[in-house]
Regions:
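P-loop/Walker A NTP-binding region and its immediately flanking N-terminal helices
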Residues: 1-151, 160-161, 169, 179
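Short loop-to-helix capping motifs
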Residues: 21, 191-192
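Aromatic/hydrophobic pocket-lining residues that form π-stacking "cages" and hydrophobic walls in ligand
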Residues: 55, 166, 185
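A Lys-centered signature of the CheY-like receiver
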Residues: 155
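A short helix-loop-helix "switch/interaction" segment in the helical subdomain of ASCE P-loop NTPases
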Residues: 171, 180-191
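Short glycine/serine/threonine/alanine-rich loop segments
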Residues: 175
């Protein structure tokens, strides 16, 4: 059996598995339950808090297939041409899902021209398109974009919550931690 890093092995697979972001997962669950899902979301918070994982789970809960899920690294695809290509793609119908779901990771890295090219699509998206913009630097996302999104701020989980998670993972992996090690790891993890 190949070794798998712990962050991959214990990545949340459902909203229930997400720790410390109940304000986000609860709101998204309610939207799904009410059938009132928006077209644009902005997930903001420091690295390692689960923004991309929650976006993937959100897509999964909306029954979006892999063929209709687009993950775009905006740090390396941040040009006007990249966004124009996305704008063209968004207007084609989904393959078999109710939605085409776009995750733009590191969205704050888009160029000014790219933001301008994206704004029209964000203002008047097709009914089958959902966008999740994930950022570690909310202040770099233009106000005109923020105002068109539902903004969710991801918070660092409590040290106590992280300590419990560390204990559970250690137990699952067959390790016994020396007293205080779980708290030290939680402190050094700084919320992620």
């Amino acid at each position: 059996m190949a070794h798998q890093s712990l962050y991959r092995a214990y990545r949340p697979q459902s909203f229930r598995d997400v720790r410390g972001q109940e304000q986000v997962t609860g709101a998204l669950r309610e939207e799904i339950k009410a059938g009132k899902v928006g077209h644009a979301y902005l997930f903001a918070g420091s690295r390692g808090l689960g923004k991309t994982s929650v976006a993937r789970i959100f897509a999964q809960e909306l029954k979006v297939s892999d063929k209709d899920l687009y993950e775009i690294d905006a740090a390396s695809h941040n040009s006007v041409e990249d966004i124009r290509s996305l704008n063209e793609n968004v207007h084609t119908l989904p393959f078999g899902s109710p939605y085409k779901f776009y995750i733009l990771d590191e969205a704050h890295m888009l160029s000014k021209g790219a933001w301008n090219a994206f704004l029209k699509t964000l203002e008047e998206p097709p009914a089958h398109a959902i966008f999740v913009l994930a950022t570690t630097e909310l202040s770099k996302v233009p106000d005109t974009v923020q105002s068109r999104c539902q903004v969710f701020e991801f918070r660092k989980p409590s040290r106590e919550g992280l300590t419990k998670l560390i204990d559970a993972v250690a137990k699952e992996e067959g390790y016994t931690l020396a007293p205080g090690v779980d708290d030290l790891v939680a402190l050094l993890a700084d919320g992620s």
